[in-house]
Amino acid sequence: KLVCNHTGSNMLDGVAAAFVLAAKNNGKLDADYASIEIDEASTVRVFPHFKPDYMVLTNLFRDQLDRYGEIDITMKLLDRAMKMAPKMKVIVNGDDALSAYLAMESGNVYVTYGIPGQVFDQKETGEIREGRFCKRCGERLSYDFYHYSQLGSYHCPKCGFARPEADFAAEAIDMTHGLKFEIREKQGRVTPVEVNYQGFYNIYNILAAYSAARTGG
């Protein structure tokens, strides 16, 4: 059985409400797992009350800026939260330099997912992107290609920080009718995926869910 804040309430009150609603009349919780979406700033308020076994870190985009002002603020909040749960395993989108840096520097055990091959002909663009500079040394990152926003194949020419090899990689992508691709795990297992969803971003969503399920056993 699963506890989930499916209504989308992802701050402290909403997370608490999800557990309350899942409890029986006697107050006991009859559940095997909890899959909870938590607002970035709320992680530091939620984690003192329970320590997750796993955290999925998808990306750090500009949609957080209207609430927190700067990506750096969001990163500091997430870093504080991860330090509150040192035994928590992080499942991170390695195609995002900001998220990957957070996971690498956290001290937590982490696994990565991503799309290693170039899908679109997008090597340069005027689009505003976060994470143009290496968080480790400040040098401008060099990209072999972009998928969208700052997601892509990056490396730092100065300190060597680079996109990690994906533990779970989406390959053989076909978006002609819905989404069709393969998920290749580092140890060799290949799982075919075919869904009616549209949108390249949904490949990342499916990868994140698959990676979390496989990592959690």
Spans of features found by a protein language model:
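Phosphate-binding loop of NTP-binding sites
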Residues: 1-116, 122-133
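Adenine nucleotide phosphate-binding catalytic loops in nucleotide-utilizing enzymes
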Residues: 114-217
